[in-house]
């Protein structure tokens, strides 16, 4: 995925626009954050029913771009992968959700399109019993199904 598309997708996620579903709809119709931002001044040609809020958000992207540049620099420095929705690595099942995020961030080398995926969401204040339980659960799960992808919810 090219860095410009990643940067532009981060920009879209940082706009002061309160309808993520609307932004997702626009992204799916256009297929690229770069195309959206290149056509931001005439977005109604692409999306005739664009809301006034969307038009206002796209009219001023400077602050969102500054924040996105800082975020992308941080991601690159610390080896954090940014995956846009139009990237082949983006989880296909997640794309089917009406409220799928425009992008995901992760570290590692996991195939996010594994056949079997389990999400484990923990707590910020785990007890020793909970730590032991999840450690044994994950160990047993890996033996039963070695190809399972275990995703942390980062509670």
Predicted regions span which residues?
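Short, positively charged patches
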Residues: 1-139, 143
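Structural motif
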Residues: 85, 151-154
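Catalytic cores of nucleic-acid endonucleases
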Residues: 147
């Amino acid at each position: 995925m090219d860095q410009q598309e990643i940067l532009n997708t981060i920009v879209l996620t940082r706009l002061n626009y309160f309808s993520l579903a609307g932004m997702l709809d626009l992204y799916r119709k256009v297929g690229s954050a770069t195309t959206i931002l290149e056509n931001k001044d005439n977005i109604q040609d692409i999306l005739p029913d664009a809301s006034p809020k969307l038009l206002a958000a796209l009219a001023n992207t400077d602050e969102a771009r500054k924040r996105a540049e800082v975020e992308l620099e941080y991601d690159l420095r610390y080896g954090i992968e940014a995956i846009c929705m139009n990237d082949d690595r983006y989880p296909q099942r997640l794309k089917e959700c009406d409220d799928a995020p425009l992008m995901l961030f992760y570290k590692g080398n996991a195939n996010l399109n594994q056949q079997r995926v389990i999400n484990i969401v923990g707590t910020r204040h785990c007890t020793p019993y909970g730590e032991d339980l999840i450690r044994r659960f994950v160990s047993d799960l890996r033996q039963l199904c070695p190809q399972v992808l275990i995703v942390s919810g980062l509670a």
